[in-house]
């Protein structure tokens, strides 16, 4: 049976065209063209200020994803903490299906819960408070009414502050809370969890379920999770 592929945390930006080139190479590969489905679990872009922003980066990525979709490859997207404002307009342009924060898939007989992963980091209370605020629909609507330049400046400032705060935060609170994560997996009746966000690529075998953490992408290394009837394995992008 055709495999499914999972990626997250590419953090694409015009400042790092090498990362965009890596993604486009994968999307154009025969492996992607023959996939059962491709799941992008958030932070595809380093930041997103609205579907009305038109750039060479956004357009080229949407165009290549659309080509896969037109070939019959299902492409799914879960919003991340950097690109949570991606909406239906961009997803339609790219031929992607927008998924909610949590979804359960039947992958080759294994009930699999997928999410970006930021909601699992409950020990980072400051971030969770911030997340709750910026996910308010009314606030998002007001933000998207601002001129594009204002939105970009505000997003850049918030990103700068977030980066500074991250440097002084204890590493453990930026990882998932084990107890909360286990409860979520049980609540959804899943046997496996796949998420990104923490950038700590690993396959964990925990009490009663498998937790797979996707890695972030770098110019010199990127990996893709391949899932098929034989299980799940990380494959270096260079193999494609």
Curated annotation (Swiss-Prot):
Its cofactor is Mn(2+). Gene3D superfamilies: 3.60.21.10. Mn(2+) 1 binds at residues 9, 11, 43, 199. Its main location: membrane. One of its GO terms (cellular component) is extrinsic component of plasma membrane. It is a peripheral membrane protein. Mn(2+) 2 binds at residues 43, 81, 116, 197. Keywords: Cell inner membrane, Cell membrane, Hydrolase, Lipid A biosynthesis, Lipid biosynthesis, Lipid metabolism, Manganese, Membrane, Metal-binding. Coiled coil: none annotated. Its EC number is 3.6.1.54. It comes from the Bacteria. The keyword Manganese applies. Belongs to the LpxH family. PANTHER family: UDP-2,3-DIACYLGLUCOSAMINE HYDROLASE, UDP-2,3-DIACYLGLUCOSAMINE HYDROLASE-RELATED. This is UDP-2,3-diacylglucosamine hydrolase. It comes from Neisseria meningitidis serogroup B (strain ATCC BAA-335 / MC58).
